[in-house]
């Protein structure tokens, strides 16, 4: 049996093993990022504004005169009041939801034959925040706001009533209603997280 000759590639592999070349390559990445500004936000002292399309707490849009004219036909079979929820108790949100136990919707028939929603509860402990209920709503009543601080000490407080949902939507519409629909609220906040983006040409 003859002596095996080592090729140039084998010599380089041995040299890399002795000098820890791969280790130094990995360490260079670490050292390069060590000098960069961290992207972490010191929550709760510092808070970022979520984008308008953020999937936070749900809200109920109310009858305020800004709804489309096509919804005026609802007057024939629904009893509604100004500044109250647009919900028509069609149960489409509950049907579309992967967790239908999340909703508790009740409506009553009034003496004049019209229907009135008396209860709309959402148990956020069951919610996946997928937004399927918002897409399914035929009257554009349901929306998702930018409210994300929903932690509570009691399970009972995780159930949102219709009044809570109305307040969330009114507040969201006043704060962000005229804002353009963008992924990031502004370039400053995006740069704070990811640095200045330079396009390669």
Swiss-Prot record:
Its EC number is 7.1.1.-. Gene3D superfamilies: 3.30.70.3270. It catalyses: a quinone + NADH + 5 H(+)(in) = a quinol + NAD(+) + 4 H(+)(out). Its cofactor is [4Fe-4S] cluster. NDH-1 is composed of 14 different subunits. Subunits NuoA, H, J, K, L, M, N constitute the membrane sector of the complex. GO terms for cellular component: plasma membrane. NDH-1 shuttles electrons from NADH, via FMN and iron-sulfur (Fe-S) centers, to quinones in the respiratory chain. The immediate electron acceptor for the enzyme in this species is believed to be ubiquinone. Couples the redox reaction to proton translocation (for every two electrons transferred, four hydrogen ions are translocated across the cytoplasmic membrane), and thus conserves the redox energy in a proton gradient. It is found in: Cell inner membrane. Belongs to the complex I 23 kDa subunit family. The gene is nuoI. SUPFAM superfamilies: alpha-helical ferredoxin. Keywords: 4Fe-4S, Cell inner membrane, Cell membrane, Iron, Iron-sulfur, Membrane, Metal-binding, NAD, Quinone, Repeat, Translocase, Ubiquinone. PROSITE patterns: 4FE4S_FER_1, 4FE4S_FER_2. [4Fe-4S] cluster 1 binds at residues 87, 90, 93, 137. [4Fe-4S] cluster 2 binds at residues 97, 127, 130, 133. This is NADH-quinone oxidoreductase subunit I.
């Amino acid at each position: 049996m003859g002596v095996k000759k080592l090729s140039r590639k084998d010599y380089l592999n041995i040299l890399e093993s002795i000098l820890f070349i791969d280790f130094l390559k990995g360490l260079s990445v670490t050292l390069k990022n060590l000098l960069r500004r961290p992207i972490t936000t010191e929550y709760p002292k510092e808070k970022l504004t979520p984008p308008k399309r953020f999937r936070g707490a749900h809200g109920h849009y109310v009858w305020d005169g800004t709804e489309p004219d096509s919804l005026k036909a609802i007057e024939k079979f629904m009893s509604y009041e100004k500044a109250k929820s647009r919900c028509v108790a069609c149960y489409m949100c509950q049907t579309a939801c992967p967790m239908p136990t999340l909703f508790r919707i009740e409506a009553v028939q009034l003496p004049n034959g019209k229907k009135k929603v008396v209860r709309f509860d959402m148990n956020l402990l069951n919610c996946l925040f997928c937004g399927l209920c918002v897409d399914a709503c035929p009257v554009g009543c349901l929306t998702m706001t930018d409210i994300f601080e929903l932690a509570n000490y009691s399970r009972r407080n995780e159930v949102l009533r219709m009044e809570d949902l109305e307040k969330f939507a009114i507040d969201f519409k006043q704060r962000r209603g005229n804002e353009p629909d963008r992924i990031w609220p502004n370039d400053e906040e995006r740069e704070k997280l990811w640095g200045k983006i330079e396009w390669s040409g």
